[in-house]
UniProtKB/Swiss-Prot annotation:
InterPro entries: Macro_dom, Macro_dom-like. Residues 1-175 form the Macro domain. SUPFAM superfamilies: Macro domain-like. This is Uncharacterized protein SSO2899. NCBIfam families: PRK00431.2-1 (NF001665), PRK00431.2-3 (NF001667), PRK00431.2-4 (NF001668). Pfam families: Macro. It comes from Saccharolobus solfataricus (strain ATCC 35092 / DSM 1617 / JCM 11322 / P2). It comes from the Archaea.
Amino acid sequence: MYKNPYGLEIYLIKGDITEIEADAIVNAANSYLQHGGGVAYAIVRKGGYIIQKESDEYVKKFGPVPVGEVAVTSAGKLKAKYVIHAVGPRYGIEGEDKLESAIFKSLLKADELSLSSIAMPAISTGIYGYPFEICARIMANVLKGYKPKTLRKVMICLYTKDAYDVFKSIFNSILKN
């Protein structure tokens, strides 16, 4: 467990994000909120079609979610109240600032919804191709400087041992007091 200067508790967890109990689960989404692969597909498969249905309604009403921004739906059958769909950048196409924004806006949205805990995957490291090292560095720096309102606990959920090991090493160097 790590703690940022503002008391935010940060946990690294190796496992399946769809099994985590949290007020919100962050989904690594695309702009059209079409949850067809990776963590997005796993979230809809476990949480139920309602998540995709609400996502479709969101895009119909508000248009595609810009890269670096977030949208919110219910969490269906997941052990959460909400899914925060964060649209991360594609490696080599959109910049690191968009990844920083997607992470920051996810935390901000959790506070806007008065949540105390969220689970977050390694955004943009799947089909969008971001190296774990870059994602971990950006995430650790955003978390280090984030001043929460109601948010108390952030669980970074990593699916593979490789991802977990990289995040642990980088989080140790950036977040260890």
